[in-house]
């Protein structure tokens, strides 16, 4: 009987702790505070910029809506063990420090990595849309 009660208590404790795992939320700057978003491929000198207010708002909103939390952690300034990535830099209007996230594909899945904050899986549509920016002149 004592073993049974111990097993039940342990099981309930495990379930409670498992349910308390928080989902990290990707926190991007507010679109009103951004003057420009720059997009640059890792090994390229080619930098594309987005400076239209509605495009900035739309991109930030889409990334936030379509990002799913993962258990992966970001422990470096830039993604590691990734062949190629896109640097997405948010230039703030009234602040010296800019925000940056990285978009990359790993094992046929697309991720956004925010240095030291976390890694989120994103919908392939977002990745494709950002990739298309490099195919057209803005």
Task: Give short role names for the model-derived ranges.
Residues 1-5:
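Positively charged n-region of N-terminal signal peptides that target proteins for export
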Residues 16-19:
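C-terminal motif of bacterial Sec signal peptides marking the signal peptidase cleavage site
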Residues 21-23:
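Bacterial signal peptide processing site
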Residues 29-45:
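Post-signal peptide N-terminal segment of mature Sec-exported envelope proteins
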Residues 40-74:
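Post-signal-peptide N-terminal segment of Sec-exported extracytoplasmic proteins
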Residues 69-109:
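Short, structured surface segments that line ligand/substrate-binding pockets
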Residues 114-138:
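C-terminal partner/receptor-binding element of secreted or periplasmic proteins
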